[in-house]
Amino acid sequence: PGKELYESLGCIYCHSQQVRPEEFGADLLRGWGRRRSVPRDYLFDDPPLLGSMRTGPDLANTAQRQPSAPWHYLHLFDPQITSPGSVMPSFKFLFDVTDEEPRSTTDAVQLPESYVEDQRWIVPSQRARELVGYLLSLDQKHALEDVQ
């Protein structure tokens, strides 16, 4: 479900999921992966979401670079908090804002004190959890001996 949400929200229009070889850019120098992406990385993706735009960073290995679900929730809620100057839109509609304390406060998004608009709780919806689950599955760290 997270992959379908990634597609339906149009994330693919600004993010690619392919670490390009050195001769095509600085992906490896940027730390977007330990190696370039190869066809085997997409063997079980249907469809593979390679993308071509780089308005935002490549997400092929976002689970390596940002393995924290709370970071992703915060970034989706308001990208300006985690990435000042980002052109990514806010996905606040994926969160429930409530006066009721969640079952576990670890379920709530922890906003910086300087940002807090009010004292209500911001809780990721099921859709937000699915999207973050998908983002945390994007990891091409497995070694491929024949790939440099």
Model-identified regions with their sequence ranges:
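Sequence/structural segment immediately N-terminal to covalent heme-attachment motifs in c-type
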Residues: P1-Q17, G31-R34, Q148
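Aromatic side chains
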Residues: Y6, Y42-F44, Y134
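Residue-level detector of short, conserved catalytic/binding motifs and their immediate flanks
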Residues: L9-I12, P57, R129
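Hydrophobic/aromatic-lined pockets within catalytic cores
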Residues: G10, V19, L136, Q140
